[in-house]
């Protein structure tokens, strides 16, 4: 084998290992616990409970490296259910509450560059969350909320598989934390907007470089930042439509490469660079029950699968 062939073979191995590690510890899903829907930042009265169920579908038809290179013959289909329970309880004079989120479902048809990632079914790491409104002014239709999320690594994980559901909600297989700040502003009787920023923190993990190679490496993911925006128009008291944006920045992930620079090198495995357009319509069928339908599409991606089409169907029940 020539030097060029050896280099090409090594590069191919590292690419396959990087992609496998993205799937193994980084998550390839269409769901995120801190992903907001329109008017979520308006607090409910103290003592209110809300049960929310989501069906989420994602069709991913291309994969992009961290340098922006498109890898052809790549795909992933995602079908998930997400159960979310929210309880509101004032803290002093400030609205506040707690929530728990549990995602389950399947990822199938996974492949990158023609190499199969297989399929998986299971549950994601549970999301535990608390939130509070340090400022809420119903007279001015202004609301400022701060929320925290914690993801203990309790989801479905098998180091022998490329795809694992454990990371599908938090974006990481190991311990993950998130701090989110959100603002809702109503302007006139019909228009409102929601804006949020959040930063995620990820704990290091260890695991095989590939499911079929028992070589353990340390995996690291830098913190990432996400920005979200919804512009909402209420056509009636019950029916609203919205257009939105979601963007991820940073979040580079890598593993310590044992065969590069004497074990001191790094191999990039992914990033949280993504820009998504969203559109939603919601309808209250009764004062307690709401339906929401959302469609979305990634307009740019780096360090993961690019979602060609995403669908969200949400039911919300207030009691």
Regions found by a protein language model. Give the residues of each.
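Short loop/turn motifs that connect adjacent beta-strands in outer-membrane beta-barrel proteins
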Residues: 39-47, 88-97, 135-144, 187-191, ...
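Residues on the lipid-exposed face of transmembrane beta-strands in outer-membrane beta-barrel proteins
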Residues: 53, 82-87, 128-134, 148, ...
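Transmembrane beta-strands of outer-membrane beta-barrel proteins
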Residues: 49-51, 96-100, 128, 142-148, ...
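Outer-membrane pore/translocation modules
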Residues: 105-220, 269
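Residues that define the transmembrane beta-barrel architecture of outer-membrane proteins
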Residues: 47, 75-81, 120-126, 142, ...
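Outer-membrane beta-barrel biogenesis signature
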Residues: 28-52, 60
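Transmembrane beta-strands of outer-membrane beta-barrel pores
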Residues: 55-61, 102-108, 134, 150-156, ...
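Outer membrane beta-barrel transmembrane domains
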Residues: 64, 70, 207-208, 214-319
